Amino acid sequence: MATKFPSFSQGLAQDPTTRRIWYGIATAHDFESHDGMTEERLYQKLFSTHFGHLAIIGLWVSGNLFHIAWQGNFEQWVADPLHVRPIAHAIWDPHFGQGAIDAFTQAGASSPVNIAFSGLYHWWYTIGMRTNAELYQGSIFMMILSAWALFAGWLHLQPKFRPSLAWFKNAESRLNHHLAVLFGFSSIAWTGHLVHVAIPEARGQHVGWDNFLNVLPHPAGLGPFFTGNWGVYAENPDSLNQAFGSADGAGTAILTFLGGFHPQSEALWLTDIAHHHLAIGCIFVIAGHMYRTNFGIGHSIKEILETHNPPKGTPGDLGAGHKGLYDTINNSLHFQLGLALASLGVVTSLVAQHMYSMPSYAFIAKDYTTQAALYTHHQYIAIALMCGAFAHGAIFFIRDYDPEANKDNVLARMLEHKEAIISHLSWVSLFLGFHTLGLYVHNDVVVSFGTPEKQILVEPVFAQFVQAASGKAMYGMDVLLSNASSSASLAAQNIPGDHYWLDAINGNTDVFLPIGPGDFLVHHAIALGLHTTTLILVKGALDARGSKLMPDKKDFGYSFPCDGPGRGGTCDISAWDAFYLAVFWALNTVGWVTFYWHWKHLAIWSGNVAQFNESSTYLMGWFRDYLWLNSSQLINGYNPFGSNNLAVWAWMFLFGHLVWATGFMFLISWRGYWQELIETIVWAHQRSPIANMMGWRDKPVALSIVQARVVGLAHFSVGYVLTYAAFLIASTSGKFG
């Protein structure tokens, strides 16, 4: 008889109930819990999965390149990026009648197509790609890279090529390699591409495989580099009237420090970007030589941590500092993953911010729907990564934390004074929540009674001060860069060459948008969401080992549900339920963030900033003038007269609501409910002649509480994302194309 799924757990494989299937799926990637798993085997399996992950990413990129080259309009778009709408791919749908075919035959295509809101056209154009042939070449290259990555993953699972546990635990060597080679070397390589290919293309000089060896990226060649006269590479930048992609007004500089934006493409200067990557690359290459490995020189991370102790003789014992942390982190994959996810989460949110405020891709600032989609996309990814960071922090405390090895160090002391941390986060959340909601509701009441002048409107003076210090003149605050005679301004004037930062911050760009009372309120609403999410995540991790109500929680494992007051209130210390609740709050918060970004920009793009400024100070303004007003076009995708090209978003909007609402059925429930439900369904099936023709291999049993809630959370999250994605894209593209 064939072995039952899952092969990695004999205990589960022999389970006679449907628990076998669901727990098998749930623990498929929890390698630590698999039968016969050793620490070395665990590291080897994870190492190989990295190559599989790279292969999937490569395949995805390859597919994008291939479909745009085959079914897109890249070459037509390149000829006129401001007026041609980029095509993502063709649509073939057997349900389409003539009306739908006509509605989706757009952007100069001869058959139904989807419009691209990914920014890929802008990216490829900026980095020097101009033809479909180049896209095909890129696609084939990425496909080969994916195949190579898959082979590498397979190879490192073979006995002769499996790295040892000592190799994985060599933190200094790994850090040097990641810093110098992966970050440093790749940044310098990217500078090379920008200087040798992208910048010449932006000046109308094609560089391809046929001529890249004999086209000098700079007229002076490598002479200035070897003589130390590097300033030559910054001389003669592109002029302010340069037409992007042509020699008209082009300069010869390759590494500049101009600041601001190219006036026509409204993106950062490519020569500034090249300079940035070169500097970053050099810093990382230096950083990659800092840690002691084979030659006995450089720092030992363990020594650095052991040396970081609080001063002796300080009033109150400050503990053992960072002693024991090196081994704790180096021996815990969950701790390392938590740190990596938190770092990546912050960086992803920063990418969302920078992609719109300081766009690096030519003409993307004028593709409003793409800007909205990319901002929203990156903020949603950021919250998922941040929640994951704390989830693995909780698992670390349950599976990997050793109280003896961390006695009285900073980690142990975090656990010891967790009540202070949690209660501080709690009062901050309560303060922000009551005061922000109080202001909004007060304003709602006075507006609804016809006295809008009685609103409490608070100017964000501290934020305006920061903007003024950075050079924004409109607030009339003579401080730092807003004051021509300040030390900051004088220092800026002494930097040689032309600089355009002040033009950018005071011009019609997205750098430091003007802010007022509406921004002040929504800023504090977002702060409430962030602090509440953090409270739930931090409490979930710090209470994962146990709390006052259940000090031995760690002995019950990780899959411990919040099960009401029956056992003395286990909701207090279920890391699972803390994670679920935090995801709801994170989605809530990212909703406010993206609503704010989108509405403010809709007002700017349509030339009607007064609408945001006047309506954003009370809740009904948000519901009526942002959500309701902007969903009307979307819902009209289908109407009595047929359908238009918003129909797909209208359908997705409705379907997203359905998925979202389904989630609540799984959330408002308990285990007895699921057992009754499943037994009722089984009873009905057993009395139906067709369903009874097949044997029941597994006895159906109820979902556990933790499982039922994750099903609810999955529906809530997916529905939430689908609904807002449809709303965002349809409401923006319906207005601006």
From Swiss-Prot:
The residues the record assigns to binding chlorophyll a B3 are 665, 673
EC number, as in UniProt:
1.97.1.12
Q: Which GO terms describe its biological process?
A: photosynthesis
Q: Which UniProt keywords apply?
A: 4Fe-4S, Chlorophyll, Chromophore, Electron transport, Iron, Iron-sulfur, Magnesium, Membrane, Metal-binding, Oxidoreductase, Photosynthesis, Photosystem I, Thylakoid, Transmembrane, Transmembrane helix, Transport
Question: GO molecular-function annotation terms?
Answer: 4 iron, 4 sulfur cluster binding; chlorophyll binding; electron transfer activity; magnesium ion binding; oxidoreductase activity
Cofactor descriptive note: PSI electron transfer chain: 5 chlorophyll a, 1 chlorophyll a', 2 phylloquinones and 3 4Fe-4S clusters. PSI core antenna: 90 chlorophyll a, 22 carotenoids, 3 phospholipids and 1 galactolipid. P700 is a chlorophyll a/chlorophyll a' dimer, A0 is one or more chlorophyll a, A1 is one or both phylloquinones and FX is a shared 4Fe-4S iron-sulfur center.
Q: Where in the cell is it found?
A: Cellular thylakoid membrane
Which residues of this UniProt protein bind phylloquinone? 674
Taking the first listed entry, what is the main subcellular location of this protein, grouped into a coarse class?
Answer: membrane
* Reactions catalysed, as given in the entry: reduced [plastocyanin] + hnu + oxidized [2Fe-2S]-[ferredoxin] = oxidized [plastocyanin] + reduced [2Fe-2S]-[ferredoxin]
Return the GO cellular component terms, semicolon-separated. photosystem I; plasma membrane-derived thylakoid membrane
Q: Which residues of this UniProt protein bind [4Fe-4S] cluster?
A: 562, 571
Query: Which NCBIfam families does this one have?
Result: psaB
Provide the assembly information: The PsaA/B heterodimer binds the P700 chlorophyll special pair and subsequent electron acceptors. PSI consists of a core antenna complex that captures photons, and an electron transfer chain that converts photonic excitation into a charge separation. The cyanobacterial PSI reaction center is composed of one copy each of PsaA,B,C,D,E,F,I,J,K,L,M and X, and forms trimeric complexes.
PANTHER family recorded: OUTER MEMBRANE PROTEIN, OMPA-RELATED, PHOTOSYSTEM I P700 CHLOROPHYLL A APOPROTEIN A1-RELATED
Name by which UniProt lists this protein: Photosystem I P700 chlorophyll a apoprotein A2
Origin species: Parasynechococcus marenigrum (strain WH8102)
Protein's gene: psaB
